[in-house]
Amino acid sequence: MMIILNAPRFMTNTRLASTRRLASSLLSQASLRSRQLNPLFTSSYSTRSSSLKDRLAELIPEKQAEIKKFRAEHGQDVIGEVTINQMYGGARGVRSLIWEGSVLDPNEGIRFRGYTIPECQKLLPSSPNGKQPLPESLFWLLVTGEIPTLSQVQALSADWAARSQLPKFVEELIDRCPPTLHPMAQFSLAVTALEHDSAFAKAYERGMNKHDYWKYEYEDCMDLIAKTVPIAGRIYRNLYRDGVVAPIQMDKDHSYNFANVLGFANNEEFVELMRLYLTIHADHEGGNVSAHTGHLVGSALSSPFLSMAASLNGLAGPLHGLANQEVLNFLITMKKEIGDDLSEETIKSYLWKLLNSGRVVPGYGHAVLRKTDPRYTAQREFALEHLPKDPMFQLVSRLYEIVPGVLTEHGKTKNPYPNVDSHSGVLLQYYGLKEQSFYTVLFGVSRTLGVASQLIWDRALGLPIERPKSFSTEALKKMVETK
């Protein structure tokens, strides 16, 4: 039996009815149009239930049975081993996590439910006048493994818009933050405060069947995703603008509303950039700090709000979420020194000076990838179309041509190719979003999609609390000595 939760207390009956009519209209009117606009859609289309929650209710028993059978047949199979170096080295490469939404291939890059980024760009629905996938469509794919129809995506947009209003006390909490408090700290603070209205926490306190966990988790995850947009917008407008935040528009998509609350919706290219940005940054396997943290905290049955707040705190760390700022600072410094001279000789000279001083080239290399990051390629293609003559993009483009050869000759990197962070800062700067300290908030809004999709499945599959075994150095020495 499906559980239908009551509308949020802040939503008036009139607004709720209006939103339901909008979603119903979108579902009924857009089915044929989606096939006309997207001829590449194949049998992988989600063609059964039009509601994401209803579709999940159909898929979950199938997945549960699949995993039960798989574990019965292969539960004792060994898939890897752990070395002492891995234990001291951040558990890099240790095969120990379940993450359904994406898998990172060293050569092809990220695959979202089996689809590469170029495939997602071709298959996932876009806005009527746009080319980039709508992040809503990627979320549907991450959750179900299926390509949604345009009508399903538009209904999801309407649902998120309807859930987006913040409780008054959360707005006041953000407004009372000192301007010296980092935007990521404000973001985490506001998301934590949403725990006040957690459907999962309230249902758990009342007592609920464990088979119903996912239904309440789903409601919280949808509220979480919807509310990250006005939270981020309020933080940005308070810190860098006049404090006035545009209202969410019920008939617009997630990315448009995000651009709108930031104050950039009058530029359609920026809206398209946000669609691209939110899509390609949404998920990147489960072992990175933000993804793993969300999964770990959620395994204790903390609500999605508490889990995502912890995830954001991990993302705020300079080793995880600040890479694109470091790249941008590198590019700005380099541009000041070499000016408009983008000759191979000048750029190589600058790079060798950098490397010989013991520093690295920011934005190049990756812990897993061994080819150019397809997320970089997607941003490069966007820049080639919309800002080919921008001086900073031209510098990025020349580095793309020259750096791999220099790093290969240098011989100290396994991957001399650019990663996702090598490009995003230049794009944001071009369109006027110049406040670098806010860039990680953009990352967090996007990463919420990936973390939330897995949290739903964590509860649906009944995954237990995470509890790996730890050892002291002395205990490890004794283990080695007894061999």
UniProtKB/Swiss-Prot annotation:
InterPro entries per record: Citrate_synth-like_lrg_a-sub (IPR016142), Citrate_synth-like_sm_a-sub (IPR016143), Citrate_synthase (IPR002020), Citrate_synthase_AS (IPR019810), Citrate_synthase_euk (IPR010109), Citrate_synthase_sf (IPR036969)
Enzyme class: transferase
PROSITE patterns: CITRATE_SYNTHASE (PS00480)
A GO BP annotation: citrate metabolic process
Pfam families per the UniProt record, alphabetical: Citrate_synt (PF00285)
Main location: mitochondrion
Gene Ontology cellular component terms for the protein in this record: mitochondrial matrix; mitochondrion
Keywords: Mitochondrion, Transferase, Transit peptide, Tricarboxylic acid cycle
Location relative to the cell: Mitochondrion matrix
Presequence range in chain numbering: 1-16
Source taxon at top rank: Eukaryota
Pathway: Carbohydrate metabolism; tricarboxylic acid cycle; isocitrate from oxaloacetate: step 1/2
Catalytic activity: oxaloacetate + acetyl-CoA + H2O = citrate + CoA + H(+)
Known EC number: 2.3.3.16
GO molecular function terms listed in the Swiss-Prot or TrEMBL record: citrate (Si)-synthase activity
Active-site residues, as the UniProt record annotates them: 320, 366, 421
CDD domains hit by this protein: ScCit1-2_like
Family recorded in the similarity comment: Belongs to the citrate synthase family.
NCBIfam families: cit_synth_euk, PRK09569.1
Other facts noted in the record for this chain: Citrate synthase is found in nearly all cells capable of oxidative metabolism.
Protein name: Probable citrate synthase, mitochondrial
Species name: Schizosaccharomyces pombe (strain 972 / ATCC 24843) (Fission yeast)
